[in-house]
Amino acid sequence: MNTKILLCIYLGLFLFTVAMMTDSKNERSPLESTKQHAGWAQEQLAMTNGNKLYDTAFMAGARHQATLDIEYLQRRYAYATDLLGLTDPSSIARGNSIYQDIFSEDLQASFFGPGVDTIKKSGISGWLELVTNSLGPMGPTQHLIGTQLVDIKELEIDDFGNIVKGEALLRSYLQAWHTLPDQKVWLALGTYHSKVRFSDGRWKIWQMNLELTVDETRQMND
């Protein structure tokens, strides 16, 4: 066979082989690219889900702590009110200090119920005056806080899970015992309807409405 013809055949086979190898590489490249893209997407999804779980855990912890702190406001109020019912200056000063700590300066408070003329007071000093004047003629008192329900309306946290802003409603059942002269006791049942907000690093009550449900005067030691 002519040498030129053989060279042409060999050259053709070589070019055909090169072309086939190039096509094979081109066919694999999209698949490999797709696999790489899928792997990257899965990594991004995992990171996103991880961040969401992290944020959710932070928010759950913040809501739990907020609920405890909000409930404690009304409990401290009950304790402070009992202190104000005592006659010694030290107890009155402690009760007043707690009021300043749990109430916001723009406090709006009221007392209402069946057979009672609604009383409204503005500011901490206004409510403090009403309480001290009401409890003054009585003996020791005991304000018991029962069932409490917290409804968080708004809650914002920073990147570290710290609360920076919040609004909530607080409902607390009340049972209050007030000693009277002649071995008598005045028992009152009611509900505190309070609104609280988070500002300056703490929760405070800015609105509190005391609803009297029922009351009676009893003779002790009968």
Residue ranges and their predicted role:
Residues 1-23:
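Classical Sec-dependent N-terminal signal peptides that target proteins to the secretory pathway
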Residues 27-101:
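Short, low-complexity N-terminal intrinsically disordered segments enriched in polar/charged residues
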Residues 29, 33-35, 39-43, 162-171, ...:
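Short beta-strand edge/turn micro-motifs at domain boundaries
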Residues 73-76, 103-105, 144-146, 188-192, ...:
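Residues that flank catalytic or metal-binding motifs in active/ligand-binding sites
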Residues 81, 103, 174-176, 209-212:
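Short beta-strand segments enriched in hydrophobic/aromatic residues
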Residues 87-92, 156-166, 181-184, 200-204:
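Short, solvent-exposed loop/turn segments that connect beta-strands within catalytic domains
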Residues 93-173:
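A solvent-exposed, acidic/Ser-Thr-rich amphipathic alpha-helical stretch
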Residues 137, 176-187, 215-216:
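Short, cysteine-centered beta-strand-loop-beta hairpins and adjacent loop/turn segments enriched
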